[in-house]
Regions:
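N-terminal intrinsically disordered/low-complexity leader segments
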Residues: 1-20
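Helix-turn-helix
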Residues: 21-24, 28-70
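Conserved acidic functional residues
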Residues: 54, 65, 76, 169-176
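Hydrophobic alpha-helical connector segments
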Residues: 70, 81-110, 161-168
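Short, basic, alpha-helical segments at the C-terminal edge of helix-turn-helix-like DNA-binding modules
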Residues: 73-79
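Amphipathic alpha-helical packing segments from all-alpha helical-bundle domains
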Residues: 84-89, 94, 106-108, 125-152
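Helix-loop "lid/cap" segments that line or gate small-molecule binding pockets
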Residues: 97-104, 112-122, 198-199
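Hydrophobic/aromatic-rich alpha-helical bundle segments in the mid-to-C-terminal region
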Residues: 124-136, 151-197
Length: 203
């Protein structure tokens, strides 16, 4: 129930209820896929978590692969896809550290990414194209940032922008896995900062 301008309670329309249900399904699928992966998690697991039938769930998402892609896009809409900092003038180091710390604060977001990214290399995985395109966007984005630093004379001698970009992404994914296994022993933001300080000259 909601309240209209006259103070009288009014019922929410079907669109609002449908949107709420979709968000509930996405949240449940996020939890299931993060814990069990795409292949290990089932539509019934998601439906049970939401408290609805699998048939009703399929009304919102026609297939399991549709649900997976919706969850991945939902994740990026909540956390950012890493390619467009909110402030284009934000320094690369600051943008990376901010994103890493932000991701740590959202329950399950790193688990979901790590599990599904690893699964996506297998044949026939519906997330393969998503992750392939995502890595291509990330490499292009970070290559542009490192190229800009090189033009400003701030990239250390011998460091190539393309290699620095690919290495940053590889480190980030790898350190996330270590952090998931031992969160109290791994300083994710500190490791990323350390790498960037190795390749970027101070101002």
């Amino acid at each position: 129930m909601t309240t209209n301008e006259a103070g009288r309670p009014s019922r929410r329309g079907p669109y609002a209820k449908s949107t709420e249900r979709r968000h509930a399904i996405l949240g449940a699928a996020h939890a299931v896929f993060a814990a069990r992966g795409y292949r290990g998690g089932s539509l019934q697991d998601v439906a049970d978590l939401v408290g609805m039938s699998q048939t009703s769930l399929l009304h919102y998402f026609p297939s399991k692969s549709d649900l997976l892609l919706a969850v991945l896009n939902w994740r990026d809409s909540n956390t950012g896809d890493g390619t467009t900092p909110p402030d284009p003038e934000e320094a690369l180091v600051d943008a990376v550290i901010r994103q890493a710390r932000f991701n740590e604060e959202i329950p399950g977001v790193i688990e979901l990414y790590t599990v599904l990214c690893a699964e996506s290399v297998t044949d026939g995985h519906p997330g393969r194209e998503f992750f392939t395109e995502r890595f291509e966007r990330l490499r292009r984005s970070y290559t542009r940032r490192f190229t800009q630093l090189a033009e400003e004379g701030r990239l250390r001698p011998g460091v190539q922008p393309e290699a620095a970009a690919a290495s940053l992404i590889a480190l980030w994914d790898g350190i996330q896995t270590q952090w998931l296994l031992s969160p109290d022993s791994v300083d994710m933001a500190g490791c990323l900062r350390g790498y960037l300080e190795l390749v970027i000259l101070p101002e």
